[in-house]
Amino acid sequence: MTNPVSALSDMSVSNLNGNQSSRQLQILLANETVRVGKRLKIDVVPFGGIEADIWADAGQKNVYKELDRILAEKTGGGDWRPSMAQDVLKGRPTEIMQMNGFVSSQGKSIGINTPINDVVTKMIMDIDKRLIKPSFTNIENIMSFS
């Protein structure tokens, strides 16, 4: 889930994992994504070194804390940016509709709310259109409403 969060914030992955708000956003995105996938009977493979069922249970306080701890431990792993953030930096269109936009549309089709994927998709589309700029403020704005 680092792809859109890095693109939104213009932060490297190691910096994302060092920030509580960006870790929270990654966890919420992963939770919605796995819940949609499981409802669609998709075999969601582990990602980020973590089993899909754990991401699906991120709404439980103890599970959320463990996920947050795991992500925080990945801080300092290098100053790299995933493909979507590189697209933003180079002014290329992103793959947001094939990723988070897909989760949002599939969620709607099966009655699962995906408010975090919805807003992230909209904001990345606005970045693609150059209506807003990538900034950590984007993450803060999303988290203030969640």
Question: What is the predicted role of each segment?
Answer:
Residues L25-S146:
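NAD(P)-dependent Rossmann-like dehydrogenase/reductase catalytic/cofactor-binding core
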Residues M1-N17, S21-V36:
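Active-site-proximal catalytic alpha-helix in oxidoreductases
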